[in-house]
Amino acid sequence: MLQRWLGAPKLGKPRRQRPQRIARYFDCTWVTAWGEERARVSSLSLTGCYIESRFSVPPDGEEVRDLTIALPTGSVNLQGTAVNATSGVGFAVRFIDIDTKTQKSLSAFISVAQR
């Protein structure tokens, strides 16, 4: 118990590191069966984001196509899967198939934004 309080590392399984995440607002768009939707991203990491959308919330597991996030360094185009959807609030997107260029630009932006 004293070791935990002092911040000593625990023995056993190492903890999985959580992805770096920034909590800022960015405009975004994505394509649904009904056309282009507009909303804002409130949390962003290398593995996903949270989109606040009161009107258009896809069900869990649905593919989010052509997601474009407008960052100060330029827009990034991504795709992913909707998770943790809450109607009238928003949903998380778990990114899939990120190309190397997008990964590098997203990583560089997140590193700078966390300083």
Where are these regions (language model features)?
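N-terminal helix initiation/capping motif
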Residues: 1-46, 54, 107-115
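Short conserved beta-strand and strand-loop elements enriched in small hydrophobics
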Residues: 26-32, 62-75
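Short acidic/polar mixed-charge low-complexity motifs
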Residues: 35-37, 72-76, 89
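Short beta-strand-centered aromatic/proline hotspots
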Residues: 39-40, 78-83
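Residue-level recognition of beta-strand microenvironments
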Residues: 44, 83-85, 98
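Short, solvent-exposed secondary-structure boundary/capping segments
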Residues: 50-53, 86-97
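Surface-exposed connector loops and short turns at secondary-structure junctions
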Residues: 55-63
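Short, charged/polar, Gly/Pro-enriched secondary-structure boundary elements
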Residues: 99-104
